[in-house]
């Protein structure tokens, strides 16, 4: 873990769970595997607080545990999962994807499970149905069966998966009271055979509408009833979590489709979308290529609203194969031709375009021209860079040294003689894409950390004004629910003065820009992480 990743993990833990969980989490990140006693001693926190913090982290899949160095008889040791902590950056994106694919019901299902880490199916269905009913007009309610249907579709498409069961020693009677049973946590949920098997639940009815006076107590009652509800419905002990890997595959596919559509046209993007959809079940997460598909299969699987004749499809496939970006490759000639989507090559090209864009934005179009030239030609001397890029010697020298100082370009010395004399040495400039992508990834982590810190600072500085605004909004909602007159509502609204209202609008505008910036930088982070992981897997 780099310093920027540790800092970002700490900020995310603090924002979502508070200072105590952030203290425990960052201590585990810095010190690796620790026992409960060691963690409480080193953080100087009460043992009860450390236990609760670990429960929160385990509940959200950010901490794993298992037998320690002394074996099953020794104390349990805890290990933090930094990758899952960083996934919190993408929570808005996961929720938006669920909404775009499965509507408001899918959105609320994913939101509830992300908020609580893991939930039973019956508890999720009831909570989501209640929330949807609360937003419906009087006299309408959400049927549980509709929520169950949306939940089932999310499981069938692997966006939700069962939490792996705890593997513990069966017998409490065989061991002594002083020796607790060994408990281990499976690292891979998909190793469990029932990972995507839906339980049969006896659940019928409609969502209940909450009144404004009940809102404060609703969450407490829901937490107390969760176990009772799940045991009554028949899914006690079967908890579900969000499958981040499946969402990431969807994001990767969408990035590839978008790139093809921008480079060629919408029809080409739809053909690639069809190929990715057909092979998403048969292609592993780290595969460099999708499974080979024949032109006949692709033609039959195209959406009916795309009236593409077979000869036109063959022309599009030929165009995709011949394109320099190499998103699609040809793997054979049977069945009208066998085609694959080159996933690794697509991610490499997307990462390369990102690097070029960053260089252009920071250093200008001429520096970007030099950067692209080095990416294409591999190794060049300074004189060759000047000639190929058609840039004056002085400017080219300054730009190369600027890129070199930022570690975006590397300099390699190749001596002609053993004495390494400068006059008898070749100095070659080059761009190594993988280390450069790693460097940019660290810059992105730092940028997101800065954005979060700035947002927290803005919120803290205007805490009084935000609390006042929330109180007034609550009063207005209560008055509207009781059918108050317009004059009463106007009086309450005037409790916020014009300067305060202007300051509040400005604050919300800044917060929205910071949130938008976080999401945009996270898209770059995801692209670079996918490229780095794909490159490592292909070696």
Curated annotation (Swiss-Prot):
Start and end residues of each stretch annotated as Disordered: 165-234
Subcellular location, principal: nucleus
Keywords assigned: DNA-directed RNA polymerase, Nucleus, Transcription
GO cellular component assignments: RNA polymerase III complex
GO molecular-function term, one example from the UniProt record: single-stranded DNA binding
Any single GO BP term: DNA-templated transcription
Regions of compositional bias (Basic and acidic residues) in chain numbering: 212-230
Low complexity composition-biased segments: 167-179
Superkingdom of origin organism: Eukaryota
Subcellular location: Nucleus
Protein role: DNA-dependent RNA polymerase catalyzes the transcription of DNA into RNA using the four ribonucleoside triphosphates as substrates. Specific core component of RNA polymerase III which synthesizes small RNAs, such as 5S rRNA and tRNAs.
PANTHER family: DNA-DIRECTED RNA POLYMERASE III SUBUNIT RPC3 (PTHR12949:SF0), RNA POLYMERASE III DNA DIRECTED -RELATED (PTHR12949)
Family as reported in the entry's similarity comment: Belongs to the eukaryotic RPC3/POLR3C RNA polymerase subunit family.
Subunit structure: Component of the RNA polymerase III (Pol III) complex consisting of 17 subunits.
Protein name: DNA-directed RNA polymerase III subunit RPC3
Organism: Danio rerio (Zebrafish)
Organism lineage string: Eukaryota, Metazoa, Chordata, Craniata, Vertebrata
């Amino acid at each position: 873990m780099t310093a920027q990743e540790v800092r970002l993990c700490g900020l995310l833990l603090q924002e979502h769970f508070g200072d105590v969980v952030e203290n425990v989490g960052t201590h585990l990140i810095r010190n690796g595997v620790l026992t409960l006693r060691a963690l409480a001693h080193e953080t100087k926190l009460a043992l009860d607080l450390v236990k609760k913090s670990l429960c929160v982290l385990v509940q959200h899949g950010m901490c794993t545990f298992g037998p320690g160095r002394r074996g099953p008889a020794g104390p349990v040791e805890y290990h933090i999962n930094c990758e899952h902590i960083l996934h919190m950056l993408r929570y808005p994106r996961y929720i938006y994807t669920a909404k775009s694919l499965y509507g408001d019901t899918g959105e609320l299902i994913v939101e509830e499970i992300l908020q609580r880490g893991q939930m039973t199916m019956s508890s999720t269905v009831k909570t989501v149905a209640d929330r949807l009913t609360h937003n419906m007009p009087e006299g309408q309610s959400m049927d549980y069966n509709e929520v169950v249907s949306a939940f089932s579709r999310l499981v069938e498409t692997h966006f939700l998966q069962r939490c792996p069961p705890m593997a513990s020693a069966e017998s409490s009677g065989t061991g002594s009271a002083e020796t607790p049973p060994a408990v281990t946590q499976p690292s891979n949920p998909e190793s469990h055979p029932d990972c995507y098997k839906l339980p049969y639940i006896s659940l019928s009815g409609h969502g209940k509408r909450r009144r404004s006076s009940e809102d404060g107590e609703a969450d407490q009652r829901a937490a107390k009833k969760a176990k009772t509800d799940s045991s009554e419905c028949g899914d006690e002990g079967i908890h579900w979590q969000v499958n981040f890997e499946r969402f990431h595959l969807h994001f990767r596919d969408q990035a590839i489709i978008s790139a093809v559509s921008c480079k060629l046209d919408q029809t080409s993007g739809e053909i690639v979308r069809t190929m990715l959809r057909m092979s998403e079940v048969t292609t592993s997460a780290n595969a460099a290529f999708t499974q080979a598909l024949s032109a006949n299969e692709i033609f039959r699987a195209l959406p009916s609203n795309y009236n593409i004749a077979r000869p036109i499809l063959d022309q599009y496939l030929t165009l995709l194969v011949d394109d320099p970006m190499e998103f699609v490759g040809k793997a054979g000639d049977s069945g009208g031709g066998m085609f694959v989507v080159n996933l690794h090559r697509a991610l490499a090209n997307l990462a390369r375009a990102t690097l070029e864009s960053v260089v252009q934005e920071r250093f200008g179009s001429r520096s970007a021209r030099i950067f692209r030239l080095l990416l294409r030609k591999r190794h060049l001397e300074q004189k060759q860079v000047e000639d190929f890029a058609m840039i004056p010697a002085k400017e080219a020298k300054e730009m190369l040294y600027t890129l070199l100082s930022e570690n975006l370009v590397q300099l390699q010395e190749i001596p002609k003689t053993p004495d390494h004399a400068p006059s008898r040495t070749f100095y070659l400039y080059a761009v190594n894409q993988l280390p450069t992508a790693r460097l940019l990834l660290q810059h992105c982590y730092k940028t997101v950390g800065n954005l979060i810190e700035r947002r927290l600072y803005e919120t803290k500085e205007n805490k009084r004004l935000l609390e006042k605004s929330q109180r007034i909004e609550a009063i207005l909602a209560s008055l509207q629910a009781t059918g108050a007159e317009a004059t009463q509502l106007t009086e309450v609204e005037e409790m916020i003065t014009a300067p305060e209202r202007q300051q509040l609008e400005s604050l919300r505008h800044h917060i929205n820009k910071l949130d938008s910036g976080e999401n945009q930088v996270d898209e770059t982070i995801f692209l670079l992480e996918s490229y780095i992981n794909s490159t490592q897997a292909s070696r």
